[in-house]
Amino acid sequence: MNIEQENITNTTLTNTNNVNDKPKPKRKKTSRACNHCHKAHMTCDPGRPCQRCIQRGLGSTCEDAPRKRKKYLEDVPNSSLMSSHSINSSDHLDSNGVTPMQSTLSLPMPPVQESPFSTSAPTQSQVPAYTPSTVPQRQPSYSPQVASNYSPNHKTYSATLFQHSATSPELMQTVPEYFPELHNQHYQPSANPNQKRRTNFLSTAADLEYSTLSNILQENFGHHTTSNEGTPNSHNFSPALSPHNMPTTDTNAPPPSIQLASNDQRQVTSFNNHTKHSTPSPLNTSQTKLYEDARYPKCDETINQYFLGDTESGKMVVFPDVLTAIENMKNNDPAVYVERNSKSTLSFAMSISHESNSNNGKDGQLFKEPEEIYEKVKKPFSYTPGYHSLIAYLRKRFTKPMLVKMAESMATYRPSFIACTNSLKEHDLIFMEQCFQRTLLTYDNYIKISGTPTIVWRRTGEVAYVGNEFCVLTGWPKEELIGKDKRKFIVELLDDKSVLQYFQVFSRIAFGDFLGATMTECTLLTPNPNVKIRTGCMWTLKRDVFGIPMMIVGNFLPIL
């Protein structure tokens, strides 16, 4: 009898243990805990207030715990950052268990019951979501990348929209049809002049490069003035297109800005073909005629973009010619000028057909391979005739007080040049010239893919290499700058004030600053004496193996 009682007792204890051994349901982890759970290192849930705070009576103060900011977000205001809780709440399923199509767009959606294509009853969700039955078949799929480009607060420089979607007639028609609030908000000009504007580039690399450098130039050189000495009738067209000189005809028109984008011939050609075959929407039919006027340069009506460089007719369209045409449009046809710039910011697309790799050697000979340099360069380059020609040109152009200032700057570095070269033998001088041509051949490969207007000159100021983008920017033909039996100096391309600054900067970095790089502001002259281009210039000084300045690489960007 006792044995039976013990068996019953053991069976009861075993059943009790089995009941207690049932695993409790694990609490789902959330990506972001509340402030109380975060402080106590406890598991939290996505609800606010969370269950733990409700049990402890802390529901009124339960909120997301602040996260440590990344370094790149230190200067971003809190209002511009979207909390993860709002992102998580937008990823829920609707009442029918259907995932909303791209609901993370954060677009202003109209109510479902107002859509003429809706076949389902409206849900009780606060934010209506488009289901596949709600959207017609001809509507293109809106990815988050496309939607972010249409957002007026979007500050990321992206060229994807303008490469693939800006010229699509279906997209231009669908956006105002299904998203009228978004369409009005996107095309409503901003009343805040300090609001950062989006850029319209066809290349992401050029987009980031030009936008960053333009911001630096505006901050550092916004208070500088441009010299017009020497040409009293000259006009600087860069400030004329700045936001401060907008016509007062339309106060709601956004201020235009000029952006210079460089792309290869293949990319621009495909973009032109896509624009050619696309049919403009009915809303833009009346404005299409404004861009077909033969008096003005070729312009892409969808993004207000002018084309520079080689054209189909074989004519080279240069930057000064376009600036002159835009200035004439502003004076003669202000309505057309305002109409073009009210739709989108002014931008430029450059198409360059590069020749084979070659740089001009001495006496106009071409070097395509390094072996040619070592075989053909058998004599040192004589810098003495270059100095004599430079001084003769300066005496012809400048007055005596300005010549005195230039002579003071040259007196600080020319004796050092003479002293350094006196100890060199003829083979050393030949080797110096071979190094110059070899370095120039290497730079030629980089300059052709950078898209930045670039020019290279020797320490005497004699131009040795010109990039195609520089010719498009200034309008100077390459044959006139580095042609055979041609000797052009960099000072011939600068205005009077910039020439003085050039000698001062060069005297400072020739032997004093071995980093050899500086940024300054200068004004470039063009073949048209009435047109000047205010630019920011980045000078990189390259030295030879003897520590003597060998070449200066100048990169120019227009200040807009």
UniProtKB/Swiss-Prot annotation:
One of its GO terms (cellular component) is nucleus. Residues 1-32, 75-149, 222-260 are annotated as: Disordered. Gene3D superfamilies: Zn(2)-C6 fungal-type DNA-binding domain. It comes from the Eukaryota. Keywords: Activator, DNA-binding, Gluconeogenesis, Metal-binding, Nucleus, Transcription, Transcription regulation, Zinc. Signal peptide: none annotated. Residues 7-20, 78-90 have a biased composition (Low complexity). One of its GO terms (biological process) is cellular response to starvation. Residues 96-106, 115-149, 222-252 have a biased composition (Polar residues). The keyword DNA-binding applies. It is found in: Nucleus. Its main location: nucleus. GO terms for molecular function: DNA-binding transcription factor activity, RNA polymerase II-specific; RNA polymerase II transcription regulatory region sequence-specific DNA binding; zinc ion binding. Transcription factor which regulates nonfermentable carbon utilization. Activator of gluconeogenetic genes. Belongs to the ERT1/acuK family. This is Transcription activator of gluconeogenesis ERT1. It comes from Candida dubliniensis (strain CD36 / ATCC MYA-646 / CBS 7987 / NCPF 3949 / NRRL Y-17841). The gene is ERT1.
